[in-house]
Each structure stands twice: as structure tokens, then as C-alpha cells.
Amino acid sequence: MSGNNSSLSYKDAGVDIDAGNALVDRIKGVVKRTHRPEVMGGIGGFGALCSLPTKYKEPILVSGTDGVGTKLRLAMDLNKHDTIGIDLVAMCVNDLIVQGGEPLFFLDYYATGKLDVDTAASVVAGIGEGCIQAGCALIGGETAEMPGMYHGEDYDVAGFCVGVVEKADIIDGSKVQAGDALIAVGSSGPHSNGYSLVRKIIEVSNADLNEELEGKSLADHLLTPTKIYVKSTLKMMESCDVHAISHITGGGFWENIPRVLPEGAKAVVDGNSWQWPAIFNWLQTAGNVETYEMYRTFNCGVGLVIALPQAQAEQAIEILKAEGENAWLLGSIANAEVGEEQVEIK
């Protein structure tokens, strides 16, 4: 045995229980603001309870989990933590609505080497704001202080969301057919995808992130939070027969649109129907990125692609615009030959 008779504590090992408790106290108000009537009890229990909304006749649960990728590294480098939580919620809830799901509740996981209560509280405040935008309850979470696993006060976040959809209203792409219209819903920027390439472009171009682009710094463009499409899309679904929705995330157009198309169908996208937001033009120029690679990595200004009957396209666009979205006719669905690519950008 060692001759050192001093008594060791968890804090000596790098885990500050008092800091964790202080964080819980700080975020109670955030959690309360996201409350839904289905939630039973508050935070602090071993598990969180939530009943199903009574309006559903045959409720089907839909779930999703995600992170924010290396956008988090950029946020840490710029010491801006108040919006990354919105990104986290958005990446989860936007995946739920593509199947028609209404988000019910959200849980987060925050892991760090050394807990900075102010930073963590700022992140959770963003998560709360995201939940408010999505209409779901922040029902619980986990804060893990793990010395030796992360460098200093670096941290990572992950989210998990559960929603509900009426069985008869599940959107699975099976109704997609030639002649359907494709509606685009605009993004707020790169959202939370492609940031390893973004950071590489910043490195090789030696970019000054304080440089202004259309009245905003590059840093602000790149850290603009991911749009949350829940309320506007659910509103549109009340009046329109949506056949499919694609959330344009990692893999861009080429990877995400085919995920919701049946065999034998392809999306014909009119590349002249919109102008890329300035940040994407900057990324392409600063990194000398080929157009194909841009569409494979970034959303290029399109956050959602919605397929529905041509006769309902104008109505859908009007509803989305009334809900504050930038929406337009993006293209149409056509028949695809065997072995043909399922996305064509003209």
C-alpha cells in the first residue's frame, strides 16, 4: 500500500458533484417552459413519464437520435454555445416530421471532461429553445463529467426524441408517383452537416471568420442554428396529401432524396429554381469545391424536399409561406429506368 494516508474524494478525481447539482438548479426553469400536458412529473427521477395525446386513434411512436457533428468544434473554438442546443433538437425533430410525426418529448446527453456550469447551462438553454420551437417537452437528460475522456472543457452533445403519428397518416414514400410536385423549404444555412469540410475550407483558405458576408460575419453565418420545420410542416399536412418528405442532411441531395423514393421513381430538380444562399457560394469558392460535391455534402439552401400531388403544390407553398417558411416549386417526380440515378439536377 502507498504511504499516502490522505483521503481522496470524487472531486479529487475530477468529478464535481456540486457543479452538477448547480447545473440542474440552473436548468429547471428551461425545462418548465417546454412542458406539455402529457408529461407526468418533473426532472430528477430515474425515468421520465409521458402519456400519449388523446387525439390519436391509433398512435404509432416514432423516434430519432442525433448529434450536431463537428459544428460543435466550431462553436467551442468561437466560444459560442447558446444556439448549438437548437441544432441538436432540430436534427432530431426534423427527422420525425418526415414520417408525419409530432414530437412529444426530448432528452439530451451532455458529456465533458470538466463541467463548466455556465457553458452547459447555455447549451441546455438552447435545447429548451429548440423544444419550444418544436412543441416538444424537454423531459430529462444526462450530464456526464468524465475526466480523461475529453480534453479540458471540451464537450459533446447527443439528443433523443420520441413523437407520435396517426397510423393512417404515416408518411413512408409509398404513395410517391410520377407527376408529383417537389416543394423545397429553405434552410437557414449549412444547418448541422458538412462541418468537417467547412472547417477544412477555413483552414486551407486561412479565412477570417470576422469577415462580413451580406451584413453578417462568416462566424454568424456558420453558427446560425438549424431551422426547425415541425410546426409549419404539421400545419401544411392538415390540408395536403403529403407523399414523402426528405430532410436534407449529411449526404445532401444525392443521398437523402432517394431514401424516401420508391423503386422506379426519380426526383427531377430544377437547379435554376433558387439561388444558393451566399454562405454556400463562399464555401464553394474558398474551398474550390466542385458543384457535385456541394450537393453531396451540403443542403445548398434546401432544408426539406416535399413530394405531393401537383394539384396541391400551390396550396402547400402558400401554407408554408404563411407559417414563415421560404418555399418554392423545386421540381417533379418522374419514372426512372432500371439502374438510373434517383436524383437529377437540371
UniProtKB/Swiss-Prot annotation:
Pathway: Purine metabolism; IMP biosynthesis via de novo pathway; 5-amino-1-(5-phospho-D-ribosyl)imidazole from N(2)-formyl-N(1)-(5-phospho-D-ribosyl)glycinamide: step 2/2. InterPro entries: PurM-like_C_dom, PurM-like_C_sf, PurM-like_N, PurM-like_N_sf, PurM_cligase. Pfam families: AIRS, AIRS_C. It is found in: Cytoplasm. Signal peptide: none annotated. GO terms for biological process: 'de novo' IMP biosynthetic process; adenine biosynthetic process. Its main location: cytoplasm. GO terms for cellular component: cytosol. Its EC number is 6.3.3.1. The keyword Nucleotide-binding applies. CDD domains: PurM (cd02196). Keywords: ATP-binding, Cytoplasm, Ligase, Nucleotide-binding, Purine biosynthesis. GO terms for molecular function: ATP binding; phosphoribosylamine-glycine ligase activity; phosphoribosylformylglycinamidine cyclo-ligase activity. It comes from the Bacteria. NCBIfam families: purM. HAMAP family: AIRS. Belongs to the AIR synthase family. This is Phosphoribosylformylglycinamidine cyclo-ligase. The gene is purM.
